[in-house]
């Protein structure tokens, strides 16, 4: 684009080209993002050709198509994050081939579109899986899955292929759908067990039946998610220009040596912009409740797009387990003590998180300070006291507290409102007392457990 004048020196040429690319970066960002959407759409549609229900060899055409579809849509959650958890998401899922009803809310769901049916008013939360395949003895089982009207699938919840979640039902966080369900039932855990549930009452105009003015307002806020897309592209151009400038004034070796410094600077910029966006769009977050069709939800989603689309690729993922991530999370509002080890940036509402001295949050953990049942976001604090440990890929729900020196094992779920006593060991989904690694039973009382 726009080649420099022949008499310009190498460094001047880099500067001129970079300036022109930065000026065009909004257009470049739009074309880049739409191209990615088109590639994902065409790929998934082509992969769906010939997929049929039944058992297929893992090493077969259908087996490869199903596997590849899930891999593409898993990657799309990162590459196309701004269009998820938006008014456009149901349309996107329909374009991919899923049967999606009206007034559906969907976040970063991974699904096999040609085998998915979602009823009117259903809610698919973050990182859910629908119509996922199962493997057994070298065979892959592929079957349709259905989410009934006004049913809810919580964060990392699953509705595997061949199963139906009946209308007005709920699958809790990190839980799976049982083989048989009845309408109006709630399920928790893996394997799932029945869960008592307190329904949240709210104005229908703020949950299921919003007026046109609220739909327009939400759309306007969601358009602001284009800002982090533009900043991501602009930062990429700036990094490329900086490396080109190093080559122009020195050699490739200089660019190789100082390239890390350039990337560190880019990461700092991305983190700083994300902190600024959080403070501008939502400010300090406090415990409470907010219906789906309210500006807090929309503003929070804009700020979260900065976190996932700008800070994550440029800073947060690479900074896992370093003091830099702790500084970033403190700037986002978290209270983190001395010597804390934090490998996960998934503290959705950091203002509501307290990590004591020497606390540990392992890789892949979610310190979940909100729940979204009945289209109302409930926010509450989560506390890990001094020396407490949350094992890899575990989730802790709002109003929970891990006592001093308490350990929660990998892949576990700490339920809402649970208080785990100091010096105890816990494991499971949901957690239960865990035998210590030295063979002694965990000395623990059963925690109090709130209804979902």
Residue spans for each PLM region:
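Terminal amphipathic alpha-helical/low-complexity segments used for targeting or macromolecular assembly
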Residues: 1-96, 184-333, 421-452
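Transmembrane helix-bundle signature of multi-pass membrane transporters/permeases
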Residues: 30, 109, 176, 263-264, ...
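Non-catalytic C-terminal interaction regions
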Residues: 80, 94-97, 101, 126, ...
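Conserved short histidine dyad/triad with adjacent acidic residue
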Residues: 83, 87, 101-106, 132-133, ...
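Residue-level signal for short amphipathic helical patches enriched in basic/charged
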Residues: 95, 113, 160, 331, ...
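Soluble catalytic regions of membrane-associated enzymes that act on cell-envelope
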Residues: 99, 105, 111, 115-117, ...
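Glycine-rich hexapeptide-repeat left-handed beta-helix
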Residues: 119, 123-229, 270, 360-452
């Amino acid at each position: 684009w726009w080649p420099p004048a022949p008499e310009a020196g190498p460094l001047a040429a880099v500067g001129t080209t970079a300036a022109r690319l930065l000026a065009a970066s909004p257009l470049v960002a739009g074309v880049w993002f739409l191209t990615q959407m088109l590639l994902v759409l065409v790929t998934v549609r082509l992969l769906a050709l010939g997929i049929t229900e039944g058992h297929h060899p893992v090493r077969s055409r259908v087996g490869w198509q199903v596997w590849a579809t899930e891999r593409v849509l898993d990657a799309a959650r990162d590459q196309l994050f701004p269009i998820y958890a938006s008014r456009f998401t149901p349309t996107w899922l329909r374009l991919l081939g899923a049967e999606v009803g009206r007034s559906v809310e969907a976040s970063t769901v991974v699904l096999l579109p040609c085998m998915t049916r979602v009823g009117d008013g259903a809610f698919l939360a973050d990182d859910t899986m629908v119509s996922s395949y199962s493997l057994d003895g070298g065979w892959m089982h592929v079957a349709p899955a259905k989410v009934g009207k006004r049913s809810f699938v919580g964060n990392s919840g699953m509705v595997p292929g061949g199963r139906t979640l009946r209308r007005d039902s709920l699958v809790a966080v990190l839980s799976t759908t049982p083989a048989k369900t009845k309408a109006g039932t709630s399920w928790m855990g893996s394997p799932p067990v029945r869960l008592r549930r307190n329904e949240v009452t709210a104005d229908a105009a703020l949950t299921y039946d919003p007026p046109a003015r609220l739909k327009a307002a939400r759309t306007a806020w969601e358009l602001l998610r284009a800002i982090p897309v533009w900043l991501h592209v602009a930062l990429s151009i700036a990094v490329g220009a900086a490396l080109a400038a190093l080559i122009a004034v020195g050699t490739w070796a200089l660019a190789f040596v100082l390239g890390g410094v350039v990337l560190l600077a880019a990461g700092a910029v991305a983190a700083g912009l994300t902190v600024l966006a959080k403070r501008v769009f939502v400010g300090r977050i406090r415990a409470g409740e907010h219906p789906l069709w309210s500006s807090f939800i929309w503003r929070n989603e804009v700020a979260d797009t900065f976190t996932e689309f700008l800070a994550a690729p440029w800073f947060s993922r690479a900074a896992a387990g370093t003091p830099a991530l702790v500084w970033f999370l403190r700037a986002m509002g978290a209270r983190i003590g001395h010597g804390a080890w934090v490998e996960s940036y998934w503290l959705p509402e950091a203002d509501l998180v307290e990590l004591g001295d020497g606390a540990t949050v392992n890789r892949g953990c979610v310190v979940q300070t909100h729940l979204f049942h009945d289209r109302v976001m409930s926010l509450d604090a989560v506390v890990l006291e001094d020396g407490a440990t949350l094992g890899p890929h575990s989730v802790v729900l709002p109003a929970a507290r891990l006592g001093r020196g308490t350990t929660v094992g990998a892949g576990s779920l700490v339920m809402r409102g649970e208080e785990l006593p100091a010096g105890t060991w816990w494991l499971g989904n949901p957690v239960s007392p865990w035998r210590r690694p030295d063979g002694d039973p965990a000395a623990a009382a059963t925690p109090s457990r709130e209804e979902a």
